[in-house]
Amino acid sequence: MEKTLRISKIRDGTVIDHVPSGKGIRVIGVLGVHEDVNYTVSLAIHVPSNKMGFKDVIKIENRFLDRNELDMISLIAPNATISIIKNYEISEKFQVELPSRLIGVLKCKNQNCITNTREPVESEFEIVSKHPLVIRCVYCERTMGEKDIFT
């Protein structure tokens, strides 16, 4: 396969690679990217890949992701690769990992759950299954699949 640079290099920031084709928009959504951001975001959708057939690639200039953002990406793209770019070079590269518990990153779909009341309780979910993705609230035991999580 011929190597072609489809999106220009970034000086500093984050590259999210190996996102399943079509899920890049969802990744951008959970990262809170919107029209008023003060950094450049590039999204390539349906890029040919030897490993995956097709994939999405996201480049975010001048922004580095925190643990909660990486956890959210792992829910959408469990095999995504994160590259930290500094001065046009890869300074760090790693694959996201789906944690055994997600604390404070999602909202429980059960409106009666204690995490959705005025109580100062942070949401907490355990991973029941990775394929297909199923998580369970540790407080009310409501289970949610991928469609429940991102709608």
From Swiss-Prot:
GO terms for biological process: 'de novo' pyrimidine nucleobase biosynthetic process; pyrimidine nucleotide biosynthetic process. Binds 1 zinc ion per subunit. The keyword Transmembrane does not apply. The keyword Zinc applies. Zn(2+) binds at residues 108, 113, 137, 140. Its cofactor is Zn(2+). GO terms for molecular function: metal ion binding. Keywords: Metal-binding, Pyrimidine biosynthesis, Zinc. GO terms for cellular component: aspartate carbamoyltransferase complex. It holds the Pfam family PyrI_C. Involved in allosteric regulation of aspartate carbamoyltransferase. Contains catalytic and regulatory chains. HAMAP family: Asp_carb_tr_reg (MF_00002). Belongs to the PyrI family. This is Aspartate carbamoyltransferase regulatory chain. It comes from Thermoplasma acidophilum (strain ATCC 25905 / DSM 1728 / JCM 9062 / NBRC 15155 / AMRC-C165). The gene is pyrI.
